[in-house]
Amino acid sequence: RLIFDHADLKIPVGASVGIVGTSGAGKSTVVDILLGLLEPSTGHIYADSVDVKEPGNYRKWLKNIGYIPQMIFMLDDTIRKNVAFGVPEDKIDENRLWEVLKEAQLDEFIKTLPEGLETGIGERGIRLSGGQRQRIGIARALYNDPEVLILDEATSALDNDTEAAIMESINRLHGRKTLIIIAHRLQTIEKCDIVYRV
């Protein structure tokens, strides 16, 4: 069966776009298509009028995307290595780390820690709260300065107050990043410029 039939989503550069719907409606399918994990049976994905599936374009497209899932994968390692995930130790940019931690509103908390960026977070980030883990995920997604930020139900496991605080951090990026926010709660996307219901 078709999940989407004649779907036409327009996402303007710098806009905040919400995609909302019930479980099983196809929200994650949209994300999987944008991330290239699924290929549409028909149709195309264009970024600035360029088909991202054309040879040579796909890698460029992915480099422009920062992804924040519901469950952030955490290394049993330091805050530094969790934010600069996948970056070789000698290539980690200290200034960039602090920039993205500030964007994620986690910098002040880290400055209070005796070991700062070298603080171990434990297995699956057990030494951090759910909100702090999500903020590490935000900082990680921002580290490589993507143009597009996709939040795939990134706040759905958080309590209302923590979700509101995380969304405040995200909404501060409005206009500087293109935000695609997948949610099942309307309050999560209340500040979006455009909302698609699936």
What positions do the PLM features span?
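ABC ATPase NBD Q-loop/coupling interface
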Residues: 44-63, 164
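A short, proline-enriched helix->beta-strand linker immediately N-terminal to the Walker B motif
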Residues: 143-147, 176
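Helix-to-loop junction immediately C-terminal to a conserved catalytic motif
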Residues: 35
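Catalytic Walker B motif of ABC-type/P-loop ATPase nucleotide-binding domains
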Residues: 149-152
